[in-house]
Curated annotation (Swiss-Prot):
This is Traf2 and NCK-interacting protein kinase. PROSITE patterns: CNH, PROTEIN_KINASE_ATP, PROTEIN_KINASE_DOM, PROTEIN_KINASE_ST. The gene is Tnik. PANTHER family: MISSHAPEN LIKE KINASE 1. Its EC number is 2.7.11.1. It comes from Mus musculus.
Length: 1323
């Protein structure tokens, strides 16, 4: 009969007829956050008595359930162990909003049994306390069961205590009646850890049934909770617990300290077969319940404990940090389980006469109630306004403080910059003064030596005059003597003995004898040459690396001027190294140069060493003439000082001409070294030579050469030519130190004393032949076909600029990034006026000058790709090294957009070289210039991926990137080649073509991280960066500012789950799995919530340590977390409210292979399988059965392998995957069968591999970044590095891929690549 009463009385309840609680009850504070509503501590306005008020929204769907609950509370709450129901109210809300139902019940001020457990030392209650509480629960259940009512949700949280230690049950009958609502809300039914197996079976099988004995199972679990602090399986995910409870044996007490009566009581309650479980009345007679000590004594102990706890909690306790996250479902904003319920001193429990008190003296107190209500509302509003004002004031103060701090930092930064500029200016001024002082010293030394030489020359002149007079007299005497008669050599007086001859006569005679021995065929020629008084004086000229020193005054030697000599040195001679100064080279004697003198001069010159018998100076060096196309002697001036010089090998074409097989006499000249003695005569002509000659370099080539004297071909055809250089000389202009661009060298005007040599009517035969060969070489080079640049030069030069200077030179955008691809590139041009040498000089890309394309050694296509002329022989040897060490292909970044010269742009001389505010470096092949910033070079065809090894250098990792074209784009460029050849003027001004480009782009953030970047994750638009030393946030929405969030903690892996409001990480020294709350991290930046700062911002997932790798896998509405440990794999799953954390789902320990990489797949939406990679191969664990088996073991590789990635292929129902290891990847299914006859083959061993959501897979190697199709493994594109470097994938979203440079112990930077999705097929 009683069971029918709730249904019969439903019609009697009219929710709309319920009164409004305004003026009767008021809410004081929230004390509980339940699944079905919020529980407040309330106060009766008139009497001040406290009540528990449950507030629920009334919707049309739930009206019937609410009526049932009210009816059950009315009928069955009148028991000493059930919280008493006092009444219900409806709080009306405006249209469009649900009304609120207020259920008013007895208030239990001591909180729940769960709170009692938490506040007890060791989280365990005394056995007699447990027995008392269990007996009181059983009495309440007995009352309900007699009326055929099942509570369905017995647990510690629903068992409350009053101040007098009375036990009350709450929320009975609600769980079952609200099951349909719970299902609609997609939340978990009740609390699974306390649920009986038959209840779970009923959820799985609608035909199954259960009775009131299910409450007794829940009572047994609650008894374990009171004994051990938590129910069994509480660390498990609720879904996993629901699965395990019917399958596991009934739980038991873990500790042996409990009495046998208690253990027997647990065993009686926890009988899995509910039909064999004892009834409520039988359990009431169990010894553990029946044989209890003095009840009054137990209640006194409990009351004292409750009072002590209340005093300790008088101060606001720090609870575990609560946060809310969007689960993409309709949930309440607040989360968490009901916390302890506080009770103020003097509070008492409402009795059954509460309704009478509520309605008494209603008319008399109406006015007073209204006044109190209005006053209270005014006080509340005033309090709210005060709180808002205080908060606003605090926010304003924080803003002002931040503004002052930023202003102070800005001023300090400006002051530092100003000081640095002053220091730099002072240093430059000091260097300039030092340079001027050195120049003055050199000039003084030069003048002093000049005067000394003049005096020495005068002495020699007088001495030679005496010798000449003596020799003339001696000839006259010989003519007078008889031919056969031997006369004395000197005649002064008849009969003078040899001992009486003057000393100078003896010396002359001795020297003549020595000269006859050394060169008997020369004396008469020498005498004739010395007596020639008409030779003009010559100034010395000397050239190193194609740079000619400033003009120096000629030597004044009227009697015996020094004669220029052409010196030929073997091309096989050693290269001039950076450690050798020029004047340290050995000086050759006359005999070593005699052959060259006989060929190249009509006159034989006498060496200086035989002209002065008294000089102790070393022999004077030979002079090296400079030749121009139209002259024998040419000097250039206006050369700026302090220009570092580089020398490289000669061109391959010249090298072939000079090979022994060709029989050319050109070889001895090419590659010759300058010969310089230590005599001051030669050194004084170049006061700044030693300081300007920094070093020589040959890049990857096998030989380096310095210039030799060499004539040019047709005179006057190239007005800007540089004479006297047979090599590819390249000038690197350091604009930061010089402050001005390097200007082209203008030929100096020929001085009058040189005019006789310049207009000389004939040339030596070998020089004429040389000019002819060079003209033929130029014609041959001009007729070469154009060749597309596809290869890459791996050699690079050291950057001499400091890190600070490089940063100053970068073009920073508003978001703190540097457009790596927009850094100006240097394109090749012809050597200034020296086409027969094919010296590809450098053109400054910031300059405003243009050059004729016809003067380029190579020409530029419209798309900006460099074209190199190539002979037929070079075509055959394409891709191989020439004999001099050059690669057959030449590669340049194709970043400069070509166009005709705009109107009004002046056309400068053909050989102009201009630089502007950009430090330039020289490449190692063909003298081609490349930017020092270049770190990524594009390839137009993936087949040329195999490149020569890169050179390790100290160049700063300021990276740039270029466009990457496919073979389709290559064909389009080839089709436009003829049109590109017709371009006569090339605009070398860089144009930012990125916004209109379909090619990928790489940018970088200017921020340098002091420690190695290990991981990163996008949080909104910003980037969380994990390093060896902490967690930082890179503000991508602003100026690229970096905020430190956590210091001195290593972050190995991280993922942001914004819907859950958490950041999942592997962090710390012990590699724990920690979950950080995003709201806490946000407050670390904004500092706008002091309460949040006091609370712990993270929790650990289980007690896991030594985590190696994890993967977050979302399947339908469930988020799984699969974790690789040292020799185990754990699976956790996200539990929504009220848990709101990752909870254990399943564990697989003692694995045969150590997992290094893990993933989770759901086969055909039904079977869960863990895939993991080890040093042996790849393996699978069936989650249901726990069986493990191998799916791929690479047998062709000996030893351990390195697994890189596991990619579950789309549209395969989770059955097929691509597994990447070492430099390979294979396609297999979850049962170990190879699904595709293709192996993904990387060009090199990648350091990082990642799947991106454009259905591609990227590999980061030391030489390149490769992008391949996941479906086929085909190469879609590649970015080459300028030098070997380690890069690491961080994260990706949409069309952006983030990665970082990895430098152990050095600075690291963040890069991101923008992949244009619309053009991926054409890229």
């Amino acid at each position: 009969m009683a069971s029918d009463s709730p249904a019969r009385s439903l019609d009697e309840i009219d929710l709309s007829a319920l009164r409004d609680p305004a003026g009767i009850f008021e809410l004081v504070e929230l004390v509980g956050n339940g699944t079905y509503g919020q529980v407040y501590k309330g106060r009766h306005v008139k009497t001040g008595q406290l009540a528990a008020i449950k507030v629920m929204d009334v919707t049309g769907d739930e009206e019937e359930e609410i009526k049932q609950e009210i009816n059950m509370l009315k009928k069955y709450s009148h028991h000493r162990n059930i919280a008493t129901y006092y009444g219900a109210f409806i709080k009306k809300n405006p249209p469009g909003m649900d009304d609120q139902l207020w259920l008013v019940m007895e208030f239990c001020g001591a909180g729940s049994v769960t709170d009692l457990i938490k506040n007890t030392k060791g989280n365990t209650l005394k056995e007699e306390w447990i027995a008392y509480i269990c007996r009181e629960i059983l009495r309440g259940l007995s009352h309900l069961h007699q009326h055929k009512v099942i509570h369905r949700d017995i647990k510690g949280q629903n068992v409350l205590l009053t101040e007098n230690a009375e036990v009350k049950l709450v929320d009975f009958g609600v769980s079952a009646q609200l099951d349909r609502t719970v299902g609609r809300r997609n939340t978990f039914i009740g609390t699974p850890y306390w649920m009986a197996p038959e209840v779970i079976a009923c959820d799985e099988n609608p035909d199954a049934t259960y009775d009131f004995k299910s409450d007794l199972w829940s009572l047994g679990i609650t008894a374990i909770e009171m004994a051990e602090g938590a129910p069994p399986l509480c660390d498990m995910h609720p879904m996993r617990a629901l699965f395990l409870i019917p399958r596991n044996p009934a739980p038991r007490l873990k500790s042996k300290k409990w009495s046998k009566k208690f253990q027997s009581f647990i065993e009686s309650c926890l009988v899995k077969n509910h039909s064999q479980r004892p009834a409520t009345e039988q359990l009431m007679k169990h010894p553990f319940i029946r044989d209890q000590p003095n009840e009054r004594q137990v209640r006194i102990q409990l009351k004292d404990h409750i009072d002590r706890t209340k005093k300790k909690r008088g101060e606001k306790d720090e609870t575990e940090y609560e946060y809310s996250g969007s689960e993409e479902e309709e949930e309440e904003n607040d989360s968490g389980e009901p916390s302890s319920i506080l009770n103020l001193p003097g509070e008492s429990t409402l009795r059954r006469d509460f309704l009478r008190l509520q309605l008494a003296n209603k008319e008399r107190s109406e006015a007073l109630r209204r006044q109190q209500l209005e006053q209270q509302q005014r006080e509340n509003e005033e309090h709210k306004r005060q709180l808002l004002a205080e908060r606003q004031k605090r926010i304003e103060e924080q803003k002002e403080q931040r503004r002052r701090l930023e202003e102070q930092q800005r001023r300090e930064k400006e002051l530092r910059k100003q000081q640095e500029r002053e220091q730099r200016r002072h240093y430059e001024e000091q260097m300039r003064r030092e340079e001027e002082r050195r120049r003055a010293e050199h000039e003084q030394e030069y003048k002093r030596k000049q005067l000394e030489e003049q005096r020495q020359a005068e002495r020699l002149q007088r001495q030679l005059k005496q010798e000449r007079d003596y020799l003339v007299s001696l000839q006259h005497q010989r003519q007078e003597q008889r031919p056969l008669e031997k006369k004395p050599l000197y005649h002064y007086k008849e009969g003078m003995s040899p001992s009486e001859k003057p000393a100078w006569a003896k010396e002359v005679e001795e020297r003549s004898r020595l000269n006859r021995q050394s060169s008997p065929a020369m004396p008469h020629k020498v005498a004739n040459r010395i007596s020639d008084p008409n030779l003009p004086p010559r100034s010395e000229s000397f050239s190193i690396s194609g740079v000619q020193p400033a003009r120096t005054p000629p030597m004044l030697r009227p009697v015996d001027p020094q004669i220029p000599q052409l010196v030929a040195v073997k091309s096989q001679g050693p290269a001039l190294t950076a450690s050798q100064s020029v004047h340290e080279q050995p000086t050759k004697g006359l005999s070593g140069f005699q052959e060259a003198l006989n060929v190249t001069s009509h006159r034989v010159e006498m060496p200086r060493q035989n002209s002065d018998p008294t000089s102790e100076n070393p022999p004077l060096p030979t002079r090296i003439e400079k030749f121009d196309r139209s002259s024998w002697l040419r000097q250039e001036e206006d050369i700026p000082p302090k220009v570092p010089q580089r020398t490289t090998s000669i061109s391959p074409a010249l090298a072939r001409k000079n090979s022994p097989g060709n029989g050319s006499a050109l070889g001895p000249r090419l590659g010759s070294q300058p010969i310089r003695a230590s005599n001051p005569d030669l050194r004084r002509t170049e006061p700044v030579l030693e300081s300007s000659l920094q070093r020589t370099s040959s890049g990857s080539s096998s030989s380096s050469s310095t210039p030799s004297s060499q004539p040019s071909s047709q005179g006057g055809s190239q007005p800007g030519s540089q004479a006297g250089s047979s090599e590819r000389s390249r000038v690197r202009a350091n604009s930061k130190s010089e402050g001005s661009p390097v200007l082209p060298h203008e030929p100096s005007k020929v001085k009058p004393e040189e005019s006789r040599d310049i207009t000389r009517p004939s040339r030596p035969a070998d020089l004429t032949a040389l000019a002819k060969e060079l003209r033929e070489l130029r014609i041959e080079e001009t007729n070469r076909p154009l060749k597309k640049v596809t290869d890459y030069s791996s050699s690079s030069e050291e950057s001499e600029s400091s890190e600070e200077e490089e940063e100053d030179g970068e073009s920073e955008t508003h978001d703190g990034t540097v457009a790596v691809s927009d850094i100006p590139r240097l394109i090749p041009t012809g050597a200034p006026g020296n086409n027969e040498q094919y010296n590809m000089g450098m053109v400054g890309t910031h300059g405003l000058e243009t050059s004729h394309a016809d003067t380029f050694g190579g020409s530029i296509s419209r798309e900006g790709t460099l074209m190199i002329r190539e002979t037929a022989e070079e075509k055959k040897r394409s891709g191989h090294s020439d004999s001099n060490g050059f690669a057959g292909h030449i590669n340049l970044p194709d970043l400069v957009q070509q166009s005709h010269s705009p109107a009004g742009t002046p056309t400068e001389g053909l050989g102009r070289v201009s630089t502007h505010s950009q430090e330039m470096d020289s490449g190692a092949e063909y003298g081609i210039g490349s930017s020092t910033k270049a770190s990524f070079t594009p390839f137009v065809d993936p087949r040329v991926y195999q490149t020569s090894p890169t050179d390790e250098d100290e160049e700063d990792d300021e990276s740039s990137a270029a466009a990457l074209f496919t073979s389709e784009l290559l064909r389009q460029e080839q089709a436009k080649l003829n049109e590109a050849r017709k371009i006569s003027v090339v605009n070398v001004n860089p144009t930012n073509i990125r916004p209109h480009s379909d090619t990928p782009e790489i940018r970088k953030y200017k921020k340098r991280f002091n420690s190695e970047i290990l991981c990163a994750a996008l949080w909104g638009v910003n980037l969380l960066v994990g390093t060896e030393n902490g967690l930082m946030l890179l503000d991508r929405s602003g100026q690229g500012k970096v905020y430190n969030l956590i210091n001195r903690r290593r972050f190995q892996q991280m993922d942001v789950l914004e819907g859950l409001n958490v950041l999942v990480t592997i962090s710390g020294k012990k590699n724990k799995l920690r979950v950080y709350y995003l709201s806490w991290l946000r407050n670390r930046i904004l500092h706008n919530d002091p309460e949040v700062e006091k609370k712990q911002g993270w929790i650990t997932v289980g007690d896991l340590e030594g985590c190696i790798h994890y993967k977050v896998v979302k399947y339908e509405r469930i988020k799984f977390l699969v974790i690789a440990l040292k020799n185990a794999v754990e699976i956790y799953a996200w539990a929504p409210k009220p848990y709101h954390k990752f909870m254990a789902f399943k564990s697989f320990a003692d694995l045969q292979h150590k997992p290094l990489l893990v993933d989770l797949t759901v086969e055909e939406g039904q079977r869960l399988k863990v895939i993991f990679g080890s040093h042996t191969g790849f393996h699978v664990i069936d989650v249901d059965s726990g069986n493990s088996y191998d799916i791929y073991i690479p047998s062709h590789i000996q030893g351990n392998i390195t697994p890189h990635a596991i990619v579950i292929l789309p549209k395969t129902d989770g059955m097929e995957m691509l597994v990447c290891y070492e430099d390979e990847g294979v396609y297999v299914n979850t049962y170990g069968r190879i699904t595709k006859d293709v192996v993904l083959q990387w060009g090199e061993m990648p350091t990082s591999v990642a799947y991106i959501h454009s259905n591609q897979i990227m590999g980061w190697g030391e030489k390149a970044i490769e992008i391949r199709s996941v479906e086929t493994g085909h190469l879609d594109g590649v970015f080459m590095h300028k030098r070997a470097q380690r890069l690491k994938f961080l994260c990706e979203r949409n069309d952006k891929v983030f990665f970082a440079s990895v430098r152990s112990g050095g600075s690291s930077q963040v890069f991101f690549m923008t992949l244009n999705r619309n053009s991926m097929m054409n890229w």
